[in-house]
Structures are given as structure tokens and as C-alpha cells.
Regions:
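Short, Lys/Arg-enriched N-terminal segments with co-localized hydrophobic residues
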Residues: 1-5
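Bacterial N-terminal signal peptides that target proteins for export
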Residues: 7-17
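Bacterial N-terminal signal peptides
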Residues: 15-26
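Compositionally biased alpha-helical segments
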Residues: 32-133, 137
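Feature captures outer-membrane beta-barrel proteins of Gram-negative bacteria and organelles
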Residues: 137-158, 165-185, 199-217, 230-244, ...
């Protein structure tokens, strides 16, 4: 028997229909799973917390869930009680009430464990981490192994061969002595890919204040191979968040009992919920340069 082949346009329509139906079924299944995940996040908030509801249209609603029904939830917000379909909610995040300032939600500082280059006394929590890139040529990554131990590292990306690249490791141990007082010890270890010798610094550091306004002081000793410097390097820095997305940062170094010029820096930190960009200038006291050397870094939190 001879079968008449389906015309090209008809085949295209049939294929398009199958694809559309398949995508619709996949989307429906994903939507159903997402709705089930959201339901597990729904609960009535206490007076010490607010809830940030991210809706599927990209908008954000901030308030407290006061009632949960089968298909809707009631949210107490700054404009009164609102009835919100559960199917329209993509995510619910519970935050402390003090994160609201002048009617805006201030997300937590995503880069509270560092100033520009120097570490603060704060630690990454277990499983948290970040990917960073300093001055374009120095990418790296750091992860919280536990709430009190983190490990980081990276490798240079100079426009040269592999044998001419540097690697670095940044182990760190620390914790909170009390609220708003955090201390840590750690090291920066630098080596060459083709060179077995290492240089670096071991340090102790303390941070005093909140993640949005803090002072950090540290002391470190440089080393080369197994030889440790007898003269420490002192660091004093701080961070002040001046708006929801902007902070001011400074990081300064001095070598006591030497003629070395102190190094000071100042700059801004641009913040998103998961990413920061630092733009700064570093200068040496007495160098005669009024502006300083530019410094830029990018940090993405995960």
C-alpha cells in the first residue's frame, strides 16, 4: 500500500504542537513541584521576624504571614492585609525585623568575611562560600568547611605559561567570642607552579561591630620557606554600610619600628544580595601620589 506523505507545513504544525504540549506538561509539573516547595515555607511569623515573599512576576512583598488557607495566604504589610494566591509565590524568606530600615529591606552583607584584601574576624558558615576575582588576574574560591573552619585558594591568570603562574591557599579558623565580637587566625600561602618554595603571612584578626558597621584589627608575620619574619605587620580597617546597596571600606597597613611607609586605602563596596564589587585606591604614605593605585574585586556568594 502506498501512503501519501504528509505535506511539509502539516509536519511542521504537528511537530510544533507536540513540542508545545510537551513543554506545557513539563512546565505544569515544574510549577506543581515549585508550589509544593513554597507550601513547605509557609508559616505564621512571630513578632521578631518579617517575611520576604518573592512573587513569580519578579516583585517582592514584605510583611508577615498571618493566615494560610488552601489556595491563598494573608499577609500583613505596611499597606494593610493582603490576600495572595499561593500559586503566585516563588519563594518565602524569613528575616529579622531589624533588617527593615526606612521601609526598605536591607539584605545581609554578602561579603562580611573580608575587607578589600584582608580577612575580617567573621567566618563563613558551613556550606557557604564565594567565588572571587581580585585585580582581574587573581581568581579564587573559598568554602566554609564548618562554622569555624574555612579553606580558600586560587591561581593567577597572568598572560604567561603555566610554569610562571602562582597559586595561593587561605586556611582560616575562628568564631564569635560574643555578639559583635569575632576573632580568627589564618594564613595566606603563596607558591609558584614550578617552584617548591612558598612565601606568605600568618595572622590573627578581630572584628568588632555588626556586619553593617565594624572595625577590624589584625597582626601578621611574613614568612619565606621556614624562615619567619621577626617584625609584624599591623592592619586596621573597617566597613560602614551607608545605604541598602553601598558601603564604605578602608584597609590600612603599618610595619612598626621600621622606616617603611604605611599603606592606606579607601573605597566603596557595591552590594547585591549575592554579589559585591569593590572599587578602591591604595596609597603609600609619603609616596607623593595623591590618588593611589586602583583596586577592583568581584565576589559572588553561594
Amino acid at each position: 500500500n502506498f501512503e501519501t506523505p504528509m505535506p511539509t507545513k502539516a509536519r511542521f504544525r504537528a511537530t510544533l504542537t507536540v513540542v508545545c504540549v510537551s513543554l506545557t506538561l513539563i512546565a505544569a509539573r515544574a510549577s506543581g513541584q515549585a508550589t509544593a516547595d513554597v507550601r513547605s515555607q509557609l508559616k505564621v511569623a512571630d513578632s521578631a521576624h518579617l517575611q520576604v515573599l518573592t512573587l513569580r512576576d519578579g516583585s517582592t512583598l514584605i510583611g508577615r504571614i498571618v493566615a494560610v488557607a488552601q489556595d491563598t495566604l494573608t499577609v500583613e504589610s505596611s499597606v494593610g492585609q493582603l490576600s495572595v494566591p499561593i500559586a503566585s509565590v516563588r519563594r518565602v524568606q524569613e528575616v529579622a525585623s531589624d533588617r527593615m530600615k526606612n521601609g526598605e529591606y536591607w539584605f545581609p552583607n554578602p561579603n562580611a568575611t573580608r575587607l578589600f584584601f584582608a580577612p575580617s574576624g567573621r567566618m563563613l558558615e558551613k556550606g557557604d562560600g564565594y567565588v572571587s576575582d581580585y585585580e582581574v588576574f587573581f581568581p579564587g574560591v573559598a568554602v566554609g568547611v564548618t562554622d569555624n573552619i574555612s579553606i580558600g585558594g586560587g591561581m593567577s591568570l597572568f598572560p604567561a605559561g603555566l610554569d610562571e603562574q602562582l597559586f595561593y591557599l587561605t586556611p582560616k579558623i575562628g568564631g564569635a567570642l560574643q555578639e559583635n565580637v569575632n576573632v580568627a587566625v589564618g594564613a595566606l600561602i603563596i607558591g609558584g607552579i614550578a617552584d617548591e618554595s612558598t612565601v606568605g603571612i600568618v595572622y590573627g584578626v578581630g572584628t568588632f561591630g555588626s556586619p553593617d558597621a565594624s572595625l577590624t584589627a589584625g597582626l601578621g608575620y611574613g614568612f619565606s620557606g621556614t624562615t619567619m619574619s621577626r617584625t609584624p605587620v599591623a592592619m586596621l580597617g573597617g566597613e560602614l554600610r551607608v545605604s541598602r546597596r553601598i558601603g564604605l571600606v578602608t584597609e590600612n597597613y603599618i610595619i612598626p619600628d621600621t622606616d617603611a611607609n604605611p599603606i592606606f586605602s579607601y573605597g566603596v563596596r557595591l552590594m547585591g544580595e549575592k554579589m559585591t564589587v569593590d572599587l578602591a585606591l591604595f596609597n603609600a604614605g609619603g609616596s607623593g601620589s595623591a590618588i593611589g593605585l586602583p583596586f577592583v574585586d568581584f565576589v559572588f556568594r553561594f
